[in-house]
Amino acid sequence: MARKKASLDFEQSLADLQALVERLENGELSLEESLAAFEQGIALTRDCQGALAQAEQKVQILLERDGELAAQPFDAEPEA
């Protein structure tokens, strides 16, 4: 259940961030409201970046070697 909760938290943070961006782009907020929305957006961005960093650390590729499964860190760039 913890995995689903973390995923939902990330998804909710991302949705909230998108809504904030739309409100800011709309241009109908006062200066104070815009600053508050911007501050909230920065916090949400940091939360999302942290969640992505944690997920990246957890991602591992399982390789079969000599009949055993060995964990190898995920490499985002394919080998040339």
UniProtKB/Swiss-Prot annotation:
Keyword Nuclease (UniProt): yes
Gene name per UniProt: xseB
Protein name: Exodeoxyribonuclease 7 small subunit
InterPro entries membership: Exonuc_VII_S (IPR003761), Exonuc_VII_ssu_sf (IPR037004)
Record Gene3D superfamilies: Exonuclease VII, small subunit
Molecular function per GO: exodeoxyribonuclease VII activity
Cellular-component GO terms for this entry: cytosol; exodeoxyribonuclease VII complex
Main location: cytoplasm
Its biological purpose: Bidirectionally degrades single-stranded DNA into large acid-insoluble oligonucleotides, which are then degraded further into small acid-soluble oligonucleotides.
Annotated signal peptide: none
EC number: 3.1.11.6
SUPFAM superfamilies: XseB-like
Pfam families reported for this sequence: Exonuc_VII_S
Locations listed in the record: Cytoplasm
UniProt xrefs under NCBIfam families: PRK00977.1-4 (NF002140), xseB (TIGR01280)
Source lineage: Bacteria, Pseudomonadati, Pseudomonadota, Gammaproteobacteria, Pseudomonadales
One record GO biological process: DNA catabolic process
UniProt superkingdom: Bacteria
Protein family membership: Belongs to the XseB family.
Summary of subunit composition and partner proteins: Heterooligomer composed of large and small subunits.
Alphabetized UniProt keyword annotations: Cytoplasm, Exonuclease, Hydrolase, Nuclease
Recorded catalytic activity of this chain's protein: Exonucleolytic cleavage in either 5'- to 3'- or 3'- to 5'-direction to yield nucleoside 5'-phosphates
